[in-house]
A protein has these predicted regions:
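Short, acidic/hydrophobic/Gly-rich beta-strand patch recurrent on exposed beta strands
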Residues: 359, 513-518, 526, 561-564
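Accessory interdomain/linker segments of ATP-dependent helicases and helicase-like nucleic-acid enzymes
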Residues: 457, 462-523
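Short nucleic-acid-contacting surface segments enriched for D/E, G, S/T with interspersed K/R
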Residues: 531-545
C-alpha cells in the first residue's frame, strides 16, 4: 500500500446558506447584476447599499479607515521621521515568514528611499526560533542604530525589549498578535491592544507596515514615497498570512495584485518569472506560487535572502536570488513529502485514528512540520501536532479544525511544555524529549474531550442553487467581481442538483474529471488531488458544489466546475 493510499478520503458534507430571494432581486435591480450573482451576494449578507458598492468597486479612498485611528501610529511616524532626519539609525527586526519579511522589506524600502539609515534583521529559525532575541538587540546597538523597530513580533518579547532599553535603544513594536499585556516598548502599535480595535484587528503585519508607510509619507511629501507604490509588498503578507480578505485587507490585496502585475521591482519581476506568472496575477498565484518560494527561504536556510530579493535594484542579482528560492522550494517540497509520508506511516501503524493526532521523529525537519500538520488535518480532519528535534529539544507545530482553538488547547497542556504560542487556527511549542509521549497522550485526551462539542466532519457551504443552463462564460466573468478570493471571501460556491455522471476519467493518476449532464447541457467537473470518490460513478445522479470556471486548453475554452463536494442525489 502506498503512502497516498493510507490517507483516508474525508468526504465533505453539503450545506446551503440561508437564501434571501427578495434582497437578491433588489441587488440585481440596483447594481444591474445577474440573478445568480445577486443570490450569492444576498446569501452572504449583502444588502443593496454603500457596503455592497464598496465591495463591488473597492477604492483606497472610500474603503480604508483613517490611519490616525490606529493607536500610536502618529507618534511612531513622528518619531521615525525625527530619528531618520537626524541620522540616528533605524534597525528593523522582522519575522521569517512571508508576512514578516514582506512587512519588513516594505518599511525598509521606504526608509531607504527616504534617505534614512536603516537595516533589517531576521532571526534564524533553527538556532534562534521565532521572535526578537538578544543577539539581534545587541547587534543593533553594536552597529550604531538608535531605534529598534519590530514588525510581526514584539508583543510578548518583554525580556528582549527591557534589554534594548538598558542599552539605550528607542523601541517601536508593530505587531498583530494576541495581547495579554502591553510590552515595555516606547511605542506600541497593535490593533488588539486595549483602546484600539483598528480595522477590527484583522490587519496582518504587512498591512500594518503599509499603514506606517502611509503615515510616514504624509510627513515627508515626496513623490517617490507614494504609499500606493508599496502595495505590491503589502499584498504578499496579506494574502499569505491568511487574514480575512474583507474590508481593508481586500482593498490592499486587490490593489496590491494590480501593482504586482505591473511591478518594476527586480526581485518580484524575477520571482514572477520563475513562477511562470505573467500579467494577470491572482491570489492563487501568490498563495501557491510566490508565497511558498518566499517561505522556503526561512524554512530551509534564512529569511534574509527574501529581504535581499525584495529590496534589490540589481536585476541580475534578483534573477540569481529568485532561482535560489525556487531551488529551496523544490527542496522544501521533497522534505515535506518525506516527513508527511513518515507521519502517515506512524498514524497507520497505530490503528484507529485518534481524536488528536501527534507524529514525531528526531529526523523531522522543523522547517516543514507546520505544513505537514496542515496536511494531516486535511486528511483526517482532526487537530494535528507534528514534532521535530532541534537545539536539544522537540519543537512542535499544531493545526486545528473549526471549533477548536489551538492556543487554548496548548494552554491546557502547558504543564508538558517549555514554551508555546499561537492563535485559534495554529500554534507552536517546545518540550523536553522525556515529555513527548506524555504530551501525545494528553493531547489526544484533550482533543477527545473537545471534539464532543464540535462537528467532526468538514462541510462545504454553498452560496446558492443554480441550474446548469444558468452557467455561461458571461456569468463566470461576472463572478470574478468577487476577487480577490481567500479566507473570509471564498469563491462563489454553487450547488447543482440531480446531475447524471456521464463519464469519469483519471488525469495524471491524481485528479478526477467527471462529465456531468442535466439532460440538456454538459459540464466537466474536476476533483483535484482525488483519485476516486464513492458518489462519482457512471450513471449516478449527484448533487455537486463547486466553483464555476473557464478552462482554456490549447486555445479551446470550456466551462468547468471545480468540485468541493459531491453527494448522491436524494
Amino acid at each position: 500500500m502506498s503512502n497516498t493510499e493510507l490517507i483516508p478520503k474525508v468526504l465533505k458534507r453539503v450545506r446551503l446558506r440561508e437564501q434571501n430571494p427578495s434582497v437578491a432581486e433588489e441587488i440585481a435591480y440596483a447594481f444591474s447584476l445577474s440573478p445568480l450573482t445577486s443570490r450569492v451576494l444576498s446569501a452572504r449578507g449583502f444588502l443593496p447599499d454603500e457596503r455592497l458598492k464598496n465591495y463591488l468597486v473597492p477604492t483606497l479612498k472610500s474603503g480604508l479607515p483613517n490611519p490616525s485611528e490606529l493607536k500610536n501610529l502618529d507618534a511612531a511616524a513622528d518619531t521615525i521621521c525625527e530619528f531618520g532626519k537626524a541620522d540616528r539609525g533605524i534597525a528593523i527586526a522582522c519575522d521569517f515568514d512571508v508576512d514578516g519579511l514582506s512587512g519588513g522589506s516594505l518599511v525598509y524600502d521606504f526608509l531607504q528611499k527616504a534617505g534614512f539609515r536603516s537595516h533589517v534583521y531576521v532571526p534564524d529559525r533553527f538556532s534562534e526560533g521565532y521572535g526578537l532575541n538578544e543577539r539581534i538587540v545587541r547587534d543593533v546597538k553594536k552597529h550604531g542604530y538608535e531605534m529598534l523597530l519590530t514588525i510581526d513580533y514584539g508583543t510578548t518579547n518583554k525580556k528582549e525589549l527591557e534589554l534594548a532599553k538598558e542599552l539605550g535603544l528607542y523601541t517601536v513594536v508593530v505587531d498583530h498578535h494576541h495581547v495579554v499585556s502591553n510590552p515595555p516598548a516606547d511605542i506600541f502599535i497593535n490593533p488588539h491592544q486595549e483602546g484600539c480595535g483598528f480595522a477590527d484587528g484583522t490587519l496582518c503585519a504587512a498591512g500594518l507596515g503599509w499603514y506606517l508607510v502611509v503615515a510616514l509619507s504624509s510627513r515627508l511629501k515626496n513623490e517617490d514615497l507614494n504609499p500606493k507604490n508599496f502595495l505590491d509588498l503589502a499584498c504578499l503578507g496579506t494574502i499569505c498570512d491568511m487574514v480575512p480578505l474583507q474590508g481593508p485587507n481586500r482593498i490592499i490585496a486587490r490593489r496590491g495584485l494590480e501593482n504586482l502585475a505591473n511591478t518594476s521591482r527586480p526581485g518580484l519581476v524575477a520571482l514572477k518569472n520563475v513562477c511562470g506568472v505573467s500579467h494577470n496575477v491572482s491570489c492563487s498565484h501568490v498563495s501557491f506560487g510566490i508565497g511558498p518560494r518566499l517561505n522556503a527561504a526561512g524554512r530551509m536556510v534564512s529569511g534574509e535572502l527574501v529581504i535581499e530579493l525584495l529590496t534589490t535594484q540589481d536585476s541580475r542579482k534578483a534573477e540569481k536570488l529568485a532561482k535560489k528560492l525556487n531551488k529551496l522550494n523544490l527542496e522544501r517540497q521533497a522534505t515535506e513529502e518525506e516527513v508527511k509520508n513518515e507521519a502517515l506511516k506512524q498514524i497507520s501503524s497505530r490503528g484507529e485514528v485518534p481524536s488528536g493526532i501527534v507524529a514525531w521523529d528526531k529526523n523531522f525537519h522543523t522547517g516543514v512540520i507546520g505544513i505537514v500538520a496542515q496536511r494531516l488535518v486535511e486528511a483526517y480532519y482532526r487537530p494535528a501536532a507534528v514534532l521535530g528535534f532541534d537545539q536539544g529539544k522537540f519543537k512542535g507545530s499544531v493545526r486545528g479544525i473549526k471549533g477548536v482553538s489551538v492556543v487554548q488547547l496548548l494552554g491546557s497542556l502547558s504543564e508538558y511544555l517549555l514554551q508555546f504560542g499561537g492563535h485559534d487556527g495554529a500554534g507552536g511549542f517546545s518540550l523536553e524529549e522525556t515529555k513527548v509521549t506524555l504530551f501525545a497522550e494528553a493531547f489526544n485526551s484533550k482533543c477527545d474531550e473537545l471534539l464532543r462539542d464540535v462537528e467532526t466532519e468538514p462541510s462545504v457551504e454553498a452560496d446558492t442553487e443554480a441550474d446548469l443552463g444558468e452557467l455561461t462564460p458571461a456569468i463566470v466573468r461576472e463572478l470574478k467581481r468577487f476577487e480577490p478570493l481567500g479566507v473570509g471571501n471564498p469563491s462563489p460556491q454553487l450547488l447543482l442538483r440531480s446531475l447524471r455522471v456521464k463519464a469519469i476519467k483519471l488525469l495524471k493518476d491524481a485528479h478526477l474529471k467527471a462529465t456531468l449532464t442535466d439532460g440538456k447541457n454538459l459540464i466537466s467537473g474536476m476533483m483535484w488531488r482525488t483519485k476516486e470518490h464513492p458518489a462519482l460513478k457512471v450513471g449516478n445522479s449527484v448533487d455537486v458544489v463547486g466553483k464555476a470556471d473557464i478552462n482554456t486548453f490549447f486555445g479551446n475554452a470550456e466551462l468547468q466546475m471545480n468540485l468541493q463536494a459531491v453527494e448522491v442525489a436524494a
